[in-house]
Amino acid sequence: RHILSACKANNIKRILHISALNADSKGPSHYLRTKGEAESYLMTYGKRIANITVFRPSVIFGKKDSFILRFSNLLNYTPFLFPLACHNTKFSPVHIDELSNFIVNSIKDTKSFGEVYNLCGPKVYSLKEIVELIIETKNRNIKVIPLSNSMSKLQATIMEFVPGKPFSIDNYNSCQVDSTCHSDHSFYSDLE
């Protein structure tokens, strides 16, 4: 609401909103619900003020990202076994450079006005596969131990109290929905 007010007050006619894949006001997690609510508000009231484009990327990776680095840092403290919650959740990681280029190219593209783009990389990985790629990159000998759904939820509950909250109930709830594109726009970005 504040952003729309500022845009109106300053005669800004273009808004690029980065949301999240699976954003939905009725989504399974607080994160996805708030992303969905923001999108809905923006598309309902913002169109009167500016040309809006919404981008919904799957998980974003690149230099100093929060997703890959979170697991990389956790693996630094892991001797040989890594218990992994929500190991079957699927992602289509998007490289930040590819995402940035797509966003920049849409700025003056009138065909993107009013559009919502679900953005994914070319490959689908399970969370387990992503963590195994990180382990391989770190040249570590760590075995990933997939947790059951109930153990995943328990891990999330416990991790809520760990400093930095590396995994939370809200993360667990978000992981109940795969972060992949179906027939929507995807572009090339390579995790490997």
Model regions and ranges:
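Structural signature of the Rossmann-like NAD(P)-dependent dehydrogenase/reductase core
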Residues: 14-17, 53-59, 92, 118
